[in-house]
Amino acid sequence: MALTISRAQYVATYGPTVGDKVRLGDTNLWATIEQDLLTKGDECKFGGGKSVRDGMAQSGTATRDNPNVLDFVITNVMIIDAKLGIIKADIGIRDGRIVGIGQAGNPDTMDNVTPNMIIGASTEVHNGAHLIATAGGIDTHIHFICPQQAQHAIESGVTTLIGGGTGPADGTHATTCTPGAWYMERMFQAAEALPVNVGFFGKGNCSTLDPLREQIEAGALGLKIHEDWGATPAVIDSALKVADEMDIQVAIHTDTLNESGFLEDTMKAIDGRVIHTFHTEGAGGGHAPDIIKAAMYSNVLPASTNPTRPFTKNTIDEHLDMLMVCHHLDKRVPEDVAFADSRIRPETIAAEDILHDMGVFSIMSSDSQAMGRIGEVVIRTWQTADKMKMQRGELGNEGNDNFRIKRYIAKYTINPAIAHGIAEHIGSLEVGKIADIVLWKPMFFGVKPEVVIKKGFISYAKMGDPNASIPTPQPVFYRPMYGAQGLATAQTAVFFVSQAAEKADIREKFGLHKETIAVKGCRNVGKKDLVHNDVTPNITVDAERYEVRVDGELITCEPVDSVPLGQRYFLF
């Protein structure tokens, strides 16, 4: 017999459904559920008097020998994903990967159970009815200055770190390069203890090929070209030749001082080959004043770093001091001051906001401890989205913010994965991918996750006093969970490496325990492949006034005095 309940009762019990709108944190962004994959009346819910019990939503006969039985299920959860959209479903996990997005349960007693989403006695259950699930974030601009960065990253919802470095050496303070085979081996061994997925860039600044090849063979998933080592046309050409040969990505921080050429010379050296440009606006470095024009090319995968996101009243002042420290400049030296001033331009920073909203800039990253904050990639992304809604209005005519939300979440999930040849494994919650999942209460969305799941195992979470009688008493703060303890760390995170390194079996050679996964398809991608962020308009920059125009139209916006997801969330 059917039971009719009010919509309010349904939402209170099972969470929102199709047409319901959910506010993201204290932003002005509202996500509307587009599709509900659950069967009404057969929702799975765990707890006293609920449905996930033997003979009801849990099978009384299915063992784990049955490949359709789940290890872990998140029930009734709202999903925000660049590829799946904004939907309601159960998420089924087995062997550390997502095996189903649909209806979990017991097919002996329930209709429409997704075939490979059986709940059995071997299945752990987490109620997601009033939570939002997103894919773990990917930060592709990491200066590996200190290992404690990984903790701050995962606590913010970022589960994959790609970059370079060797610790607090001056070369690492300024550039994201792990130079040479010896350091590559040491850094892989050190990263065994980190609870996140990791990939390292080799130093791409070399005008001959063999010194680049040996770094890739030692495990580098890509090469980083940085102006502090000399971003010359010869260096660019050499790095891209090796990249094409060995199927890895090249990231570049171009020549701010225009010492060896201008933007046009760099683009000529790139010669149509795919490349990932860092802080493409230019405050973080790059051809002054017009590196932002690189975003219009179809072979350029343009990224931002988070210190310029979004444009606020404090952005300019903060950058000048950061720049002096990170690039070893001296305020007493006029040339150093001029160098700093050339990089910090309000006009191009304002344009960067709008280019993100238009889908011209495709990727968000941090520039960790080197002019950026590793724990603020997610926050700054949504602050930018909110600012653009307030200043530019709605995108499209859907009557909701879904398209803008999908555009912005793609910038730190699927698009960096596509850029670096790892989208087969991470970057979205699609079936088959590693179960790196972040769960948020809507009121804390983008700021403070409830639970971070790595490869199907809870790795970090908000946790109260361990001596309390229940899990919630204060002090509540992030603590590593069992997925980030002992030998489990090696089973819940992976290393991304080159195909050459995988063939050479560096896992065995270096004595590593984490799985190594080779990057693939780095050279046949382009801007057209970046989800919701594939726009390639004509961009011009006035060399004297720094004004930015897109297809002839001036683009600019005002800095704001305050942002959402800010101080009110960090009183304690």
UniProtKB/Swiss-Prot annotation:
EC nos: 3.5.1.5
Localisation: Cytoplasm
Catalysed transformations (reactions): urea + 2 H2O + H(+) = hydrogencarbonate + 2 NH4(+)
Cofactor(s) required for function per UniProt: Ni cation
GO molecular function, one term: nickel cation binding
One cellular component term from this protein's GO annotations in UniProt: cytoplasm
Protein family membership: Belongs to the metallo-dependent hydrolases superfamily. Urease alpha subunit family.
UniProt protein name: Urease subunit alpha
Organism annotation: Haemophilus influenzae (strain PittEE)
Gene expressing this chain: ureC
